[in-house]
Every structure is written in structure tokens, then in C-alpha cells.
Amino acid sequence: MRLWFCLSFFVVLCLEHFPGTLADERNNRDYPIRTHLHGPHIPRNNRDYPIRTHLHGHHIPRNVPESEEKTEQFLRDLSEISRLQRRPPGFTPFRGKFHSQSLRDLSEISRLQRRPPGFTPFRGKFHSQSLRDMYEIKGFKSAHGRPRVCPPGEQCPIWVG
């Protein structure tokens, strides 16, 4: 995998250095140009020459390819489409188990529907009741179904149960 990546990177690097290939397409040039390392270029006293190739190759884009125009048009259309279409009330772009309704809709639903007394949105072994309910229930229930050994006023040791 690493060898394949290195080879493809090397090929792209080589293509960038030949005129009339990737580098020219990327910089929107319709003519070959060479920088100061790789041969002659148009002399500096020509001031309307738009490309400075000395260090970083800053340039004024000549002709913007129509693919970019199409992209801009596509983005404009997309925003219009999203404004025109109304989404159903339970819909959000999030997917998965807990995002079938948006969080705001979930709170509205939970206000509208009455839940059973021991129910909370937490899941798992220790959240079948909320912690406060567990504490209140613990005061009234006997420990694990066995009767209490200690009288109600005294402190029970942990091992008696």
C-alpha cells in the first residue's frame, strides 16, 4: 500500500514538471511556461504579463473553466431547492438510533406523552429508574427481598443484610 502511494505520488510529481500536462491545466494556462529553474520565461519588463513565476507562481486566472461555473450554479440551485421544499416535522439530516427525531421534537413529544413512573430516557442496567427514584425506593424496600435485620433507628453494618 505504501509503495503504491509513493509510486502514484512520484508519477503526479513528474507530470507536474512537463509543459502541457497537469500543471498547465491546474493553473488555467493555455500556453506552456517555464520557471527560472527549468528554462527561459517571458522577460520581466513586460508588465501586463499576469503570472509571476519567480517564487510562488501567483497569477491572475485567465479563463475560468466552465466546470467551476457549473459548480457555482449547482450550489445556487441547491440552496433554492432546500428553501423551496418543506421537510416533514420529524425529519433531520442526522441518522441513527437516537436521531430519528430531532432533539427539539423529542422534548415536545416527551411533554405531550405521559410516561410511566419508573421511566427515564437513560438506558442500561443501572438506569432502569432514575437515581433519585432508586434512592427513594431503596428506603422503603427491603434489601434484595430479605427482611431487614437492624431496627429502623440504628445504623446497620454493611455485612448484615
Swiss-Prot record:
- Pfam families from the xrefs? Bradykinin (PF06753)
Chief place where the protein resides: secreted
Keyword entries, A-Z: Amidation, Amphibian defense peptide, Bradykinin receptor impairing toxin, Disulfide bond, G-protein coupled receptor impairing toxin, Repeat, Secreted, Signal, Toxin
Q: Name one GO molecular function term.
A: toxin activity
The record's subcellular locations are: Secreted
Q: Does the keyword Disulfide bond apply?
A: yes
Is Transmembrane helix one of the keywords UniProt gives this record?
no
GO CC list: extracellular region
Q: Which domain of life is it from?
A: Eukaryota
Q: Where is the signal peptide?
A: 1-23
Say which family it is in.
Belongs to the bradykinin-related peptide family.
* Name of the protein in its database record: Kininogen-2
Q: Which organism is it from?
A: Bombina orientalis (Oriental fire-bellied toad)
